Structures are given as C-alpha cells and as structure tokens.
C-alpha cells in the first residue's frame, strides 16, 4: 500500500497517535497531528514528533475542508462525533483507526481478541502459548503496544496476537484476522456507544470481514455470542465451561478438553491452572481453542497453561499481611468484571470499589456484594452510586473514604486473618488517575509500605 505523499490528519496524540505519526513519516506521508491537549499537557513526546517535521495542531481540533486531507487516522480514545470526523465523512475522506492501518501492512496471521472482560489475560496467555511453541510472536494492540509500531517485522510464518477494543474496531474497514476471539458481551462503554446494540455492532467488526477459511472463537455460554454465531462468515469454534463442544474447547471431569480433529483430547486438569476464578477458566478455554485451531498440540498448550500466573492488575496477588491476602484487580473497570473478581474467592472479602462510572447500573454488582462482601469501602466520584445500590440490597457495612491511603488503612483495620482485601473498583480510574495501571500501582505501593511497617 502506497502512502507516499498522502496528506494524513492523525487525531489524538497518545501512544497510538504517536506510533501512527512515526509509521506514516517513514512511508513519506505528509502528516499533521492534532489533539485538544496543549504541548505542555502532552509532554516530551510531542517535541520528538515536531523534530521529525510533523505539523502540530494542538489545543483544539481543526476544521476539515474538502480535499484538504487524503485520510484521517483516529486514536481509539477519540469519539467519532468530533467535528473533523463529521466533516471528513461529509466530504468522503476515509476515516480509519490505527488497527486498520496496521492490518493493511500485516503479513503474519493475526489472532485478534475482544470481549467486555478478560481481553488482556487471554491475549497475554495466547501470545505465550505461541511463543512457547516456538513461533516468533507479536503481542500488541490495546494491551499497550500499538500494532503499527511492529507489524512489518513479522512475516507469514510468524504470529500476531492482538487485544482489540470496541473503540479500535469501530474504525476498521477491511480488518479480518485469521482467528477472531470474542470472550463475552456485557454492558460497557455505553457512555461512548450510546446503547448495547451499538456496542455489539462495534464488537462484531472483529469478524464481519472474515473469509470462510478464517475462524471465530466464541463463548457458547454467552447467549448473545451464541446468537452472533449465526451471522459469522467464518468457521465457528466454541468454548464452554458448561457444555460439551463438538468443535472447540470445554470442561469434562475437571479437565480442559479440545475437539474438532477427530475425538476429544485432554489438555490439562483445571486444578493445575494457576490463575484463579471461573472467568479465568473461560480465558484459558478461549486461548486453548485459538491455539488448537492454528495447530498447537494439547501437550504444548498444557505446558504453558500450567505455568501461566496471570498479568498485572487482574486479580494480582500483592501481599499476605497477618493472614490477610491483598489483591489488586484495578483492571476491574466495570461491574461485570468486579462481579467476576468477587466470584473468584470463597473467603470473606473487604472490597474497595468506586471511581468513574461508564453509565452502567450497579444493581447486579450490589447483589453480588451482599453475597460475597463483609465490608465495602467506597471512594471516587461515583462511589456513592455503589453505596446506594448496596444499601438498596440491604447491605449496610459501608465506609466511604476520600482517597486510597484511607481505603487501605481502613481495610487493614477491618480485615481478619483468612479474609481477602480486594481492590476491584467496578469503575474507570479517570476521576483520580490517568489509567487503571496508575491506580493499581498506588494500591500496591500502599499495601507493600504497610507490610514493611508491620514487619518492624
């Protein structure tokens, strides 16, 4: 694909936008980068882009006139309702995202993974499965490394494993991974998409351009995904915790099994997995199905599954202090993710929750709180909504606090040996932090400082 001399407006100066600028600069495009933030707010990265000769329009987005640009490339965090996008579409100027751009230069087969929850764990595990099997493997996408940064370094015999979000998928045009994986669908990002129907429509972009020789891996236990299977143009592979599957992965007699290439084959005992919770069992099943579909053996898969211990900020063990286990699940940015975290433990839980809600009801979360939580500590701009929902369920052991230092100290005072202190906010971090990672790192820092003080 020839981008020589193409006039491209890159919208959003985050990691994705910066990577796109550098990529297009190498292709000798004429690149303009715009962001509503100022040069000072963006920081040093913008200086480097300026030195490359990239035109900067900062502080506000520009108007787009007919014939002014050949293409707009969007960063995933930027809504498609902004003026330059509306104008570009009016003038038939193509609008695409970094994921679509990377795909157009991809040679290696892509395993793309989406879903409301579990994406990062499944993406990391799937990448590790292929690495351990000897493949040169790129793990990229919504997981922190823009695909466009590395995509040209991977060839036909290699593997690309990409975590893809609804924000990325809604700006695709031809994107068609060799294997598309959809883990689950529950309400999320409704503040951006407007409705559950639009959210599902965006997620479905992961498979709508696939060919009959491609594969889509779907959660059979998710009724919405089972229904979506009817509209997939590719070969459907299922995974399930609750049903025996003819073509895919499933549980039988506490064993992960695979089928579809002859009779069922055993992979590993579920008790040998080192990632806790039924949702992580689903993640393991999804990764297994994707890897098996592309030729990995049950033996190869079992070796990696038995070693994999999870990823940061997803039910991440932090410390055991005086018999109390502290767990960081800062990636639990919606109620469904937090519910899955609560379901992962049998011990009584001291739960720290709250942050910025994404327009989602906390009713089901509150029911699970009443069932699993002994003490609820709330904070953040919408912590009060969780408190109100819990009180409506008859749960009253609630302590609102102002910050994370107070939350951790209060949790220490309330927790008894054998209990779990769990940070699973059910909200985004954007009211108090730049990211869920920053939130999780602060929680870990506070817990480890407390552990150090307890040891004296």
UniProtKB/Swiss-Prot annotation:
Pfam family, any one: MurD-like_N
The EC number(s) this enzyme carries: 6.3.2.9
Keyword Ribonucleoprotein: no
GO cellular component annotations of the record: cytoplasm
Superkingdom field: Bacteria
Compartments (UniProt record): Cytoplasm
Biological pathway: Cell wall biogenesis; peptidoglycan biosynthesis
Keywords: ATP-binding, Cell cycle, Cell division, Cell shape, Cell wall biogenesis/degradation, Cytoplasm, Ligase, Nucleotide-binding, Peptidoglycan synthesis
GO biological process: cell division; cell wall organization; peptidoglycan biosynthetic process; regulation of cell shape
GO MF terms held by the record: ATP binding; UDP-N-acetylmuramoylalanine-D-glutamate ligase activity
Top-level enzyme category: ligase
Reactions the enzyme catalyzes: UDP-N-acetyl-alpha-D-muramoyl-L-alanine + D-glutamate + ATP = UDP-N-acetyl-alpha-D-muramoyl-L-alanyl-D-glutamate + ADP + phosphate + H(+)
InterPro entries assigned to the protein according to its UniProt record, in alphabetical order: Mur-like_cat_sf (IPR036565), Mur_ligase_C (IPR004101), Mur_ligase_C_dom_sf (IPR036615), Mur_ligase_cen (IPR013221), MurD (IPR005762)
Binding positions for ATP per the UniProt entry: 115-121
Family: Belongs to the MurCDEF family.
NCBIfam families from the UniProt entry: murD (TIGR01087)
Chain's role: Cell wall formation. Catalyzes the addition of glutamate to the nucleotide precursor UDP-N-acetylmuramoyl-L-alanine (UMA).
Protein name: UDP-N-acetylmuramoylalanine--D-glutamate ligase
